[in-house]
């Protein structure tokens, strides 16, 4: 509920700066799906990230540079998709990042799988994994569980089936049970996207059911926006843990979609428009919070 999210998305300190609100790295994309990378970056920007870096394969860079001036884009390597040879430059940069997001539009090339695993083995920051990152790591239980404490994985039902090995029927027959079992077994924080979306804590096994969102959000790209939003929430000043960040990102994403539905109706609003609604949703959330003493207005000059 909104009151739960208000407790974990704390107001910005008046003396904060861009470094206080996290350095988000979106490392993803391929020549056929540059838009997915751009949408993930946009989701992070609109959710209040202090700085957003976008790292894309060499041939993708020209399609991304300058599209959103707030996003700092750099090409990595020379190909249409990431390869194992590209991993070292990402690993070297990762020491400066608060959180890393990977997967949207990444493609399923074998070289990209090698790249992904090399990066995940070496980085130490929290990581949000979505889309093709999950498809590439399907069945890699031993690998993922070894680093699961710093992961948030965000599959929809089909991706969850490929990743976990559960059939779609098994998942639908016991959604909460399968989600909880997976998070415990694989030792990851899980966002199982659907209607409703479930969030499961790797630490406690607690399951949270998101109340926001609507059928107008059932279109390509919404998950990419969510990836960026969860990454931004992970780096939000005062955020206590990865599961809380996932809950906040999912709730705000759905609430932004609900705002779009209210303004435009249930048809045709876009993922980018949904991201653009997030600042207003956050502003509404903040109105219901007590202001810290430094942000309270002075009355009578005292």
Task: Give the ranges of each region predicted by the language model.
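Small-residue (G/A/S/T)-rich helix-start motifs and N-terminal tracts that mark the onset
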Residues: 1-127, 135-152, 157-302
């Amino acid at each position: 509920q909104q009151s739960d999210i208000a407790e974990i998305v704390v107001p910005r300190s008046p003396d904060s700066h861009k470094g206080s609100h996290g350095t988000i790295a979106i490392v993803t994309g391929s020549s056929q799906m540059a838009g997915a990378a751009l949408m993930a970056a946009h989701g992070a920007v609109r959710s209040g990230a202090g700085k957003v870096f976008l790292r894309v394969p060499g041939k993708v860079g020209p399609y991304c540079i300058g599209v959103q001036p707030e996003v700092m884009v750099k090409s990595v390597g020379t190909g249409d998709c990431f390869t194992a040879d590209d991993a070292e430059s990402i690993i070297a940069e990762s020491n400066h990042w608060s959180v890393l997001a990977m997967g949207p539009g990444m493609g399923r090339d074998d070289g990209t799988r090698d790249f992904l695993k090399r990066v995940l083995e070496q980085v130490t920051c929290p990581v949000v994994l979505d889309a093709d990152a999950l498809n590439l790591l399907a069945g890699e239980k031993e690998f993922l569980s070894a680093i699961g404490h710093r992961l948030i994985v965000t599959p929809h039902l089909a991706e969850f089936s490929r990743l976990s090995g559960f059939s779609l029927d098994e998942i639908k027959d016991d959604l909460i049970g399968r989600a909880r079992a997976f998070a415990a077994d694989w030792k990851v924080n899980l966002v199982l996207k659907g209607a409703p979306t479930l969030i499961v804590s790797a630490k406690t096994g607690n399951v949270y059911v998101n109340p926001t969102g609507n059928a107008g959000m059932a279109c390509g790209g919404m998950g990419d926006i969510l990836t960026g939003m969860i990454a931004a929430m992970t780096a939000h000043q005062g955020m206590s843990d990865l599961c809380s960040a996932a809950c906040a990102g999912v709730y705000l994403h759905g609430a932004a979609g609900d705002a779009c539905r209210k303004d435009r109706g249930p048809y045709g609003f876009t993922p980018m428009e949904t991201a653009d609604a997030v600042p207003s949703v956050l502003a509404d959330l903040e109105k219901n919070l007590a202001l810290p003493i430094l942000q309270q207005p002075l009355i009578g000059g005292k």
